[in-house]
C-alpha cells in the first residue's frame, strides 16, 4: 500500500506557528502583550514601571494595607490611602526616625492607585501632568507622594532635606529628580518616593542613578 507523503511546512508557516505559540504562552503566564510597549522590567524583585514598561490593567499588588488603620508617625490627606505592607512598614520606620530628629509635619497625600483610578486621573489632568494608565508607579503600591504644610514648596523645607539625606537608609529613592528628566521621562517631582529596598536605594544614592539606569536601560 502506498504511503502518504508528509506535507512539508513552508518557512512562513513555521514562523507564524512560532509566533502564535509565543503569544499563547505570554497570555498563559501573564507576561503581557503590548504592541510598542515592553513588559515591565525586573532586577531581582525590583519592578520598573514607566511609559515603556507598563503594568496590566488587572495588576494588583499583594498585601495592600490601609494606612489609616495602621499606627503611623505621619499625617494622611485621606483615610483611603493604601500601600503594600512592606512599603508601609519601611515608611513608618523612616517617618518615626524623622520625628525623633524633630522633623515633623509630613503629610502622605497619595499611595496605591488602581489602573482604573489612573484612567480617571489621566483624563482629568492637563497634558503631561499625569502618567498614562499602566505607566504609573502608584499602581505598584510601592510609591507614595508626601508634602508638608508650607507655601514655599516641599523642596524648600527642612523635611525635604532630611528625606534626601536619609530616605535610602529605609529603602526609598526620590524617583524623579530634577537632573534626570531626560531619562525618566518625568519632570521633577520632589514629593514622589519609591520603595526599592535598602541595598538598591543605598547604591542609587551613592551613584546618583535613577531606576532606569540602575536596571540597565533608559526605558
Region locations from a protein language model:
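Extracytoplasmic cell-surface/polysaccharide-interacting catalytic and binding patches
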Residues: 2-111, 115-219
Amino acid at each position: 500500500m502506498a504511503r502518504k507523503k508528509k506535507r512539508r511546512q513552508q518557512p512562513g508557516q513555521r514562523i507564524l506557528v512560532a509566533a502564535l505559540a509565543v503569544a499563547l504562552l505570554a497570555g498563559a503566564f501573564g507576561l503581557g502583550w503590548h504592541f510598542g510597549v515592553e513588559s515591565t522590567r525586573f532586577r531581582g524583585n525590583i519592578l520598573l514601571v514607566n511609559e515603556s514598561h507598563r503594568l496590566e490593567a488587572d495588576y494588583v499588588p499583594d498585601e495592600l494595607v490601609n494606612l489609616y488603620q495602621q499606627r503611623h508617625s505621619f499625617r494622611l490627606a485621606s483615610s483611603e490611602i493604601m500601600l503594600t505592607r512592606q512599603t508601609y512598614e519601611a515608611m513608618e520606620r523612616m517617618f518615626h526616625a524623622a520625628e525623633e530628629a524633630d522633623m515633623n509635619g509630613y503629610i502622605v497625600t497619595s499611595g496605591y492607585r488602581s489602573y482604573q483610578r489612573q484612567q480617571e486621573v489621566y483624563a482629568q489632568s492637563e497634558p503631561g501632568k499625569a502618567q498614562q494608565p499602566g505607566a504609573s508607579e502608584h499602581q505598584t503600591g510601592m510609591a507614595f507622594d508626601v508634602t508638608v504644610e508650607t507655601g514655599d514648596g516641599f523642596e524648600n523645607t527642612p523635611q525635604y532635606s532630611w528625606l534626601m539625606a536619609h530616605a535610602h537608609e529605609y529603602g526609598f529613592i526620590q524617583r524623579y529628580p530634577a537632573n534626570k528628566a531626560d531619562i525618566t521621562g518625568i519632570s521633577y517631582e520632589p514629593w514622589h518616593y519609591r520603595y526599592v529596598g535598602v541595598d538598591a536605594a543605598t547604591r542609587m544614592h551613592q551613584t546618583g542613578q535613577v531606576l532606569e539606569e540602575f536596571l540597565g536601560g533608559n526605558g
